[in-house]
């Protein structure tokens, strides 16, 4: 396994819409394993392939307290269950050190393929439902800051630009 580099906002590659995975093969499984290692190393609960500059519809996540329940979502599709929405504090490995409340569907129905290409379905609520929607947005080239007001989004952009300058000067 290998740790991958996570792209950071405002990198335009984060805006790329991911293409479906045609075949789940050894290359796909290696990507999944590398993404899980990267996510765990970065202390995240979810990671989309777009965030590591691979523009395929692959997501990994683990919202368990003890980091023991990795989930793999290949070619995911979700549907909100009902109209009820709930704001929840979100962060993002591509926008480090910034958090904001984002309203999302309270419950979702998910269809995806697992690490071996087997189809599965599940219904999710709470943190898992939020994480599914957040990571799915990455596959569409959407970031959680896109849900914020222009003023707040501009503040995040300035903060990230300052962070990048500081990293270059170091």
UniProtKB/Swiss-Prot annotation:
It comes from Chromohalobacter salexigens (strain ATCC BAA-138 / DSM 3043 / CIP 106854 / NCIMB 13768 / 1H11). The keyword Cell division does not apply. Belongs to the polypeptide deformylase family. Its cofactor is Fe(2+). This is Peptide deformylase. Fe cation binds at residues 92, 134, 138. One of its GO terms (biological process) is co-translational protein modification. It comes from the Bacteria. Binds 1 Fe(2+) ion. GO terms for molecular function: metal ion binding; peptide deformylase activity. The active site is at 135. It catalyses: N-terminal N-formyl-L-methionyl-[peptide] + H2O = N-terminal L-methionyl-[peptide] + formate. Removes the formyl group from the N-terminal Met of newly synthesized proteins. Requires at least a dipeptide for an efficient rate of reaction. N-terminal L-methionine is a prerequisite for activity but the enzyme has broad specificity at other positions. Its EC number is 3.5.1.88. It is an enzyme of class 3 (hydrolase). InterPro entries: Peptide_deformylase (IPR023635), Peptide_deformylase_sf (IPR036821). Keywords: Hydrolase, Iron, Metal-binding, Protein biosynthesis. NCBIfam families: pept_deformyl (TIGR00079), PRK00150.1-3 (NF001159). The keyword Protein biosynthesis applies.
């Amino acid at each position: 396994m290998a740790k991958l580099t996570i792209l950071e906002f405002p990198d335009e590659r984060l805006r790329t819409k991911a293409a479906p995975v045609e075949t789940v093969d050894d290359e796909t499984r290696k990507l999944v394993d590398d993404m899980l290692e990267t996510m765990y190393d970065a202390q995240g609960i979810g990671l989309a392939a777009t965030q590591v500059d691979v523009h395929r519809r692959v997501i990994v996540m683990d919202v368990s307290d003890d980091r023991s329940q990795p989930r793999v979502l290949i070619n995911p599709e979700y549907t909100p269950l009902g109209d009820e929405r709930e704001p929840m504090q979100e962060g993002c490995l591509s926008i480090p050190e910034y958090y904001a409340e984002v309203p999302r569907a309270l419950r979702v129905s998910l269809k995806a393929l697992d690490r071996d290409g087997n189809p599965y379905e599940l219904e999710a609520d709470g943190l898992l439902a939020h994480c599914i929607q957040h990571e799915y947005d990455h596959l569409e080239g959407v970031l959680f800051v896109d849900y914020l007001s222009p003023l707040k989004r501009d503040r995040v952009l300035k903060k990230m630009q300052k962070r990048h300058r500081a990293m270059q000067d170091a």
